[in-house]
Structures are given as structure tokens and as C-alpha cells.
């Protein structure tokens, strides 16, 4: 048992700088056996200086299929800096690791096979990242590896839970380009890759060669394959992808839990949720969360190691890879009144539509306006124009301008131009109205909500953001 410090023992302040040229004063821990053992070793070796090529060789030796490093000061990573430094103060370099997936497994209409490959490749990549991180730490540089996917910082949910954006780092490190399906396409491995990122205090000499072409072929097969129409030539419909493909992740589980809570009996619950849906959610909770589609990755022919068969037999690629996914009879999860619902009914009438509640629920008024581009539906916004001003007060205050322009959306976090409709209330009140927890009519009658302009336009605006 270590003896307690004597009452008159002076405990040094670790933050107090020592005058230059003065010897370290004996501390209260110097007599400890571990401290004596450390002192006996002598001074530590200076940290190793890493070149980019040597670091890449280390990553490949640890099991990565490709790797590259990029400075945290890279201009494309400015939004990552705050989050990275919070996780590892002193970070100078981000090391992106690439793990290849088996294309045939990802392409299987049996999605259990595809999900097994996602999970296998993800776990393997996390192990690789751990080995590289330990090697860098042993060379004298603090290093850590955030998860390839999960766990995340869920106390921040529904905000940013990830420590670093692997996709942004991969693009900045010249390991690929972002495709229209919003996944990174590697020049060799195509879309069949998973990504991980190391944070390290090491400063790397040199950098990766520039990627001078876009691996995307422009074939648009990802657009054709998406069951909810989330991918368009001029944009990506985030909410459509999130509500279906990620149904068995965070928000989908919360929606199911609320459905259980809302059901007055077991019989009522069975009428709302099928046995297969309940069993599928159980499977994701018991093992790892499963994607409902990811067909955009499955059909992508890009990448030198993947492209050959597509170039030689395009009809066979359509017959053997694309068509089985298009023809598959399955449940597709959509929000009522969304563009995704209309897309499934028109494009895939043989697929079963399952209407669910929107799983994107902003926690504040500011978050509400910031999330609008993610939940906006073009269909209900076509054929009319209007400008809305919102002045929300109280603890959850926010000011915003929302413009609907014949299927397009513009959001500014200040008041701009002359409004057709002007809304004033507390931020908390408006959130409750948006979430249908408060009647807007009663809010007007009680003076909690003041609206100037054509109130019918507010109903049209609400239809653009179905919940």
C-alpha cells in the first residue's frame, strides 16, 4: 500500500512552467518504484520522422488495401478541424485507410449476404486502423482511430455524432472522388470500399500524388437502382435515403419504439408492424444494423478492378446485377406525401410501400432551419413561389428566410427581402407546431403565434416537409 503524502508535502502545479536552465525539483512520486524504473531507462528516443511513402507502407503491411495522409490544415478539411482537435489535441495529420469489399457479396439480392460483407469489411478495417495507430504511437506520436462506423458520439444525436468525416478525408487525400450516389469512388476498387481515418500528432513529409480524373463513369445506374429515388443528376435526396436504407439504425428504432408505446394492445401492434419487420429489427439490434438497400453501390461498375466485365458485357451486367435488384419484391419505407412515396408507386409498383414517420427531428429552431435542405420535397413545391420570414424568440430563438421557388428551396439564417408570410412566436412553440404537438389554430387564438400574410401558404410550405 502506498503511504499517504505527509501533510507538509508540497504538490507541484503541473501547469506551472519551469524556468529555463533549472533542474526539475524532486517530486512526491520520484521514490515510487515505477518512477525509479522509468528514470533508470534514460531519456526517451526522439519521435520518428515519417515520410508519406513509409506511412503508406506501414498501413499496407497492417492490412489496408490503400492509404494516404493529408494535413489537418488542408482547406477542404476546415469543417473537421474543431471536432478532430477535440478528440485528439495536437493532431496534425489525418491518415485515410481503404478497405476493399467483395463485389459479388455486395451485389447479391439477398441483403443478408451484402450486410454480412459490410460488417466483415468494417470490422477488419477497424482492426487495421488500430494496428496502424498503435505503431504510430510506439514511434513517438500520439494517435487514435475513431470507428469506421459505430460507435459514435450519440450524446450529440441527432446532430453530428462522428468525430471525423472519412469521405471528406479520402477525397482530400486523393483516394477517390465523391460520386453522385454520395459515396467515394476509388480509382481501382470503385464503390466497393469502406473508409477509416487515423488522427495523429505526427507531421508527415510529402503527400499523395494528385488524382487527376473522376472515377465515376456517368452511367447513372445508381439513379436507376435506388428504390426511393434518392439520387438525382442534380442532387441527393437525403431524407429519402435515410428513411429507407437506414430504417434499422437510430431513428428507425426510435420510431418503432414509439409505435410500440402508441399501440393499446399486442393485437394492435401486430396490425401496425408485421412479424418480418419486427424480426428484422430484432436482428439488427442483436447483431449489427442492416442496410435496407445500398443498391447504388451494388450496381456501380466504376473502378479499374471492377470495370472489365461491364465494358465487355454491359447487357450481362444489367441482367445479372441491376435487374434482380429492380425486380426484387420488398418493403420500401417512406414518409407519407414525400417524393420517395411517389417515386416507389410510379417506378416500382411491385414493391410494398410502408408509410413511417419522419425520423429526422431537429432538437431546436436553429437546427430546424439548417435541416430544411435535407428534408425538402420537390414535388409539393412545384408550381408556386413564396417567401417566408420567421422571427422566433425565447430561449430557442432563431431568424430565418425560407423561399420556395417552383420546386427549389432557399434558406437564409437572417431576414431577406419582402415576405409573403411573416411568422412570429417562441422557438419552442414553433417546434411543437411543426411536430404536431400543438395546434396552430389554438396558438393563434391564445396569442402564442402571430402570422401576417396568406396563412394558406403555410399549409403549402408544410407539405414540402412531410413528417
Question: What are these regions, as identified by a protein language model?
Answer:
Residues 2-125:
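Non-catalytic, usually N-terminal nucleic-acid engagement modules in DNA/RNA processing proteins
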Residues 1-3, 7, 106-108, 253, ...:
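Short conserved micro-motifs at the rims of enzyme active sites and ligand-binding pockets
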Residues 61-66, 141, 379-383:
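Short secondary-structure junctions
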Residues 66-69, 144, 387:
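Short, hydrophobic-rich beta-strand element in sensory/regulatory alpha-beta domains
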Residues 78, 114-115, 120-304, 308-320:
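Catalytic cores of enzyme domains
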Residues 85-90, 185-192, 415:
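Short glycine/proline-enriched loop/turn "hinge" motifs that connect secondary-structure elements
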Residues 91, 194, 296, 386, ...:
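Residues that flank catalytic or metal-binding motifs in active/ligand-binding sites
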Residues 320-467:
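Feature captures hydrophobic
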